[in-house]
Amino acid sequence: MRHVCRTAVLAATALVASLAAPGGQALAVDNALTGVHVVSHLDLAAGEQPENLTVERDGSLDLTMSFARRVERLTPDGHLTTLATLPAPPSGTDVPLIGRAFVGGIVQAPDGTRYVTYAAGTDALTGVWRLPRHGAPRRVAALPAAAVPNGLALHRGQLYVSDSALGAVWRVPLGGGTATIWSQSPELAGAPGKFGANGLKVRHGAVWVGNFDRGTLLRIPVGHDGTAGRVRVTADGLGPVDDFDFTGHGDDVLVATNPGNEVELVRGDGSHRTVLTAADGLQNPTAVALRGDRVYVADAAYFTAADPNILGARLNEGR
């Protein structure tokens, strides 16, 4: 396992934050988020480009390091540990939309088991992988080589997986087994060669999906029999939606737009405004995760190629 201590980096970050604004808190472009700071600077040369993250109970962050095919854990004191590395596809494999093998969404089950999506460009590797607390990662559901599994969420014993290439949402039993297409509504698709369905969450009996190419946030009800209901566009004009998370206030969400270098606060009525920009340290934000009023943003620097990082902030209720 790879261990990296970030203590010195975190100390330097704290100093920078203390100089940025009175009281040691950086100023965001909008008062919905305050105390914006860099939780950790990551190493681009080492492949540390986080695509998704989830927050553990102790405040540690589980990160998927996209093209490095790694899953890593960042502790509150700045230690970065590699939990697993997924197997590489054969040399020369062309992954749809991306070109290279790519670890995407991550979710943690109540028993601590982690699940991730993996787009590998082969029938033998693409799908949903389980990372047990002890032992090697194992694929629990196969998806076709043409799929690009991306966002991931758990709801009532089922894993829901967005597919950016096929414009679909797959459903997989938590215990593993056959993946089935749960929804393939036209609203989930992107233009040919573009990312469609991307970030995915479940809330209030519905699967919510961001469409990267269309800049929309979608809501798909889960029927009493588990089938997908009619897709509704809850917000549009958002730019390239990569990932999002709910704030805990109604259906308000924070949305990361990747090349756009912005985080948007989207209200339940579909209105939205920018709350973070590159001026706050964003470097192509790929994911947002909240625990209470703590907000974490993963920055992969896919396009800026500079300073991938994790930003932290505090959510101001009702802003």
Where in this protein do the model-derived segments appear?
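Beta-rich, blade/repeat-based domains predominating
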Residues: 43-60, 89-114, 118, 143-160, ...
